[in-house]
Amino acid sequence: MDVLSAVLLALLLIGANAFFVGAEFALISARRDRLEALAEQGKATAVTVIRAGEQLPAMLTGAQLGVTVSSILLGRVGEPAVVKLLQLSFGLSGVPPALLHTLSLAIVVALHVLLGEMVPKNIALAGPERTAMLLVPPYLVYVRLARPFIAVYNNCANAILRLVGVQPKDELDIAVSTAELSEMIAESLSEGLLDHEEHTRLTRALRIRTRLVADVAVPLVNIRAVQVSAVGSGPTIGGVEQALAQTGYSRFPVVDRGGRFIGYLHIKDVLTLGDNPQTVIDLAVVRPLPRVPQSLPLADALSRMRRINSHLALVTADNGSVVGMVALEDVVEDLVGTMRDGTHR
């Protein structure tokens, strides 16, 4: 092979190495949520990258195979080519062969590390989604051609991993833990990227999975209920007005003559019934009062109460006894902070 062809082949191998390194780091670094957003904007290559990421072990094996083969061939072709180039271009034919080969190898290694490794790696890390969308489509063509070799190496690697007790992964885990996210929020506050109100709101949102209904439940002794006027009938207008005047709340649990909860009333349900304090409210107006265990996470309680469209719920102990009450507003306030308005609760 003449010198020019050998040099061009060496540069081509460095380019191939850079291609595989860039594709590998782009696949690892690209965030699925950003790719999904790009896919929703109609970027077909984003969908291609997402699908490639779902076969991550095969993709990485293919990249490593490509890097290895390119590096071996570069060593085989590049070093002799540089030796000949130095001899012809710079008149170094009189230099001892050992020194000339050492110098040529150093030049090839430097070009390989800089252009074939570091530059493509940093380009991929600087813009992983953009780089992945550019490199992955042609990379998949190579993967299809090299699939038999990739499958053999991938299966061997997985077998070795299982032998040492490591479970192979088919997809990159990009999730962060609650603790890591809390640290990120704290750092954002200290750096001025978040104000104190935003920091508090985000912190509350993170801890909702660890907060239970018992943490926000109102004890029975603090509940202002209205009692039915007689068995089989509802409370009176006067009873509801008195409760409203005392608390300013808009919803009141209803109890029977024995003190058992039978539902709750919203103040708007009785506005059309007149202003006679002795008027008895029909039990049909009383809304159902669901029950939630005190050990239920607040996030689940929020979902349950929203699903059944109830603003109040009885809180029960493990034995089923009623120990308190929780309002939907209490759950929301634990998430976003206290809210005050003219119809609090």
From Swiss-Prot:
Compartmental location: Cell membrane
Keywords of this entry: Cell membrane, Membrane, Repeat, Transmembrane, Transmembrane helix
CDD domains assigned to the protein according to its UniProt record, in alphabetical order: CBS_pair_CorC_HlyC_assoc (cd04590)
Membrane among keywords: yes
Main location: membrane
Topology relative to the membrane: Multi-pass membrane protein
CBS domain location: 217-280, 285-342
Keyword Transmembrane in annotation: yes
Transmembrane portions of the chain: 3-23, 95-115, 312-332
SUPFAM superfamilies reported for this sequence: CBS-domain pair (SSF54631)
Any Gene Ontology CC annotation: plasma membrane
PROSITE patterns per the UniProt record, alphabetical: CBS (PS51371), CNNM (PS51846)
Stored Pfam families: CBS (PF00571), CNNM (PF01595)
InterPro entries in UniProt: CBS_dom, CBS_dom_sf, CNNM, Ion_transp-like_CBS, UPF0053_domain
Every CNNM transmembrane domain range: 1-198
Xref: PANTHER family: HLYC_CORC FAMILY TRANSPORTER, UPF0053 PROTEIN YRKA
Family, per entry: Belongs to the TerC family.
Annotated protein name in UniProt: Uncharacterized protein MT1889
